């Protein structure tokens, strides 16, 4: 049997780049909660003892940016300098301006346009992907790496492993076989976890706890065997972490946010962007389209691309490829997709309820992936029925 290895990585919510994503989306949530028409393009950067939020926001909402920054850092666990950042004592810098009037008139005509006439906020192309190898219709490598990261945070916060600190990274290599274009996972080849820890714990204790409390509950036993390789804190020491260890920036974990290297990526990040930014809304709707194709049994694996021009409502192109796994021709699947999904930005915002913020709606997406999540707020994960014409 001919097989191959494929690897996906993840980082958990205390990684400095992910901290920035969560702050940007927490600000988006706060704006949309008060003013669903908010136009938000919010970036965050962080380094030792400093968080800065900057960008363009036009909103009627009254938002305390500094309060949101500090509370988000605190929720993640950055409560003292020795864990990487002190939420209450760090410097918070804010440089927020209004959206460019040139962009505003071209995209939404200063709010005079009907939803179906709202133009894309920028040019770009986005990809959605789905595969039948997991119940989530997501790649197994990505699912396992992401769930390991989430479990790391869970056992830190519930004090199962009190030596854990917020920063951490995971990576999973899976051995696959290609079944006529569909991906069949055979076994987990390698598991890598690098997690921040306190001064008191030994490397042996770290390895034992990670195997027992993180790996065992997450990776199904059928994928592990005597030959599975474990690299558990292979650098030997990871006490300094968070923004103290590395600078962080919004939008630097776009593969972790999506499909772990499977499918394709148009390059646009998600966090801190309202739904007129097709980097986000376009990527969400093509995930829904690809997932609907696989869920309907029309293909075992599917990728969908959409592209836009700034100020133009209709997409420039829609593309589908089922990797030769389709039960009907790809051109017929494309017809079904175009009939079932409205790719105009104003309509995507309505149909996926993307103007609704608050209650951590978008902040939740900013750690542990935007896709494959079982959560009613992830409206783009709800499949649409697709039936070929008789």
Curated annotation (Swiss-Prot):
It is found in: Cytoplasm. PROSITE patterns: ADOMET_SYNTHASE_1 (PS00376), ADOMET_SYNTHASE_2 (PS00377). Its EC number is 2.5.1.6. Its cofactor is Mn(2+); Mg(2+); Co(2+); K(+). GO terms for cellular component: cytosol; endoplasmic reticulum; nucleus; plasmodesma. It is an enzyme of class 2 (transferase). Pfam families: S-AdoMet_synt_C, S-AdoMet_synt_M, S-AdoMet_synt_N. Catalyzes the formation of S-adenosylmethionine from methionine and ATP. The reaction comprises two steps that are both catalyzed by the same enzyme: formation of S-adenosylmethionine (AdoMet) and triphosphate, and subsequent hydrolysis of the triphosphate. Involved in the biosynthesis of lignin. Belongs to the AdoMet synthase family. It comes from Arabidopsis thaliana (Mouse-ear cress). Disulfide bonds: none annotated. Inhibited by 5,5'-dithiobis-2-nitrobenzoic acid (DTNB) and N-ethylmaleimide (NEM) (in vitro). The gene is METK3. Pathway: Amino-acid biosynthesis; S-adenosyl-L-methionine biosynthesis; S-adenosyl-L-methionine from L-methionine: step 1/1. This is S-adenosylmethionine synthase 3.
């Amino acid at each position: 049997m001919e097989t191959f290895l494929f690897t996906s990585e993840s980082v958990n919510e205390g990684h400095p780049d992910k901290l920035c994503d969560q702050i940007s989306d927490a600000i988006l949530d706060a704006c949309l909660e008060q003013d669903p028409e908010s136009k938000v393009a919010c970036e965050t950067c962080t380094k030792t003892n400093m968080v800065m939020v900057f960008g363009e926001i036009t909103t009627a909402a009254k938002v305390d940016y500094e309060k949101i920054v500090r509370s988000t850092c605190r929720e993640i666990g950055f409560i003292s300098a020795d864990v990487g950042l002190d939420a209450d004592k760090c410097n918070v810098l804010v440089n927020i301006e209004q959206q460019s009037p040139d962009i505003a008139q071209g995209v939404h005509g200063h709010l005079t346009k009907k939803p179906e006439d709202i133009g894309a906020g920028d040019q770009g192309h986005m990809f959605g992907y789905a595969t039948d190898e997991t119940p989530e219709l997501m790649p197994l490598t990505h699912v396992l790496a992401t769930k390991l990261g989430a479990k790391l945070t869970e056992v830190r916060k519930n004090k199962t492993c009190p030596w854990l600190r917020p920063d951490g990274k995971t990576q999973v290599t899976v051995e696959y076989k290609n079944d006529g274009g569909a991906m069949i996972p055979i076994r987990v080849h390698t598991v890598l976890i690098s997690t921040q820890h306190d001064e008191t714990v030994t490397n042996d204790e770290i390895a034992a706890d990670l195997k027992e409390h993180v790996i065992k509950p997450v990776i199904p036993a059928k994928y592990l065997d005597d030959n599975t390789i474990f690299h558990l804190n292979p650098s030997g020491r990871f006490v300094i972490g968070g923004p103290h260890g590395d600078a962080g920036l919004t939008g630097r974990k776009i593969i972790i946010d999506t499909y772990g290297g499977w499918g394709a990526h148009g390059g646009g990040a998600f966090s801190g962007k309202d739904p007129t930014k097709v980097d986000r809304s376009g990527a969400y709707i093509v995930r829904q389209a690809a997932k609907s194709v696989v869920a309907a049994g029309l293909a075992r694996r599917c990728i969908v691309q959409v592209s836009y021009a700034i100020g133009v409502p209709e997409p420039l192109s829609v593309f589908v490829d089922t990797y030769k796994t389709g039960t009907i021709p790809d051109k017929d699947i494309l017809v079904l997709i175009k009939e079932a999904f409205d790719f105009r930005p104003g309509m995507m915002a309505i149909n996926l309820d993307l103007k609704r913020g608050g209650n951590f709606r978008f902040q939740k997406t900013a750690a542990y992936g935007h896709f494959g999540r079982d959560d009613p707020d992830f409206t783009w994960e709800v499949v649409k029925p697709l039936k070929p014409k008789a």
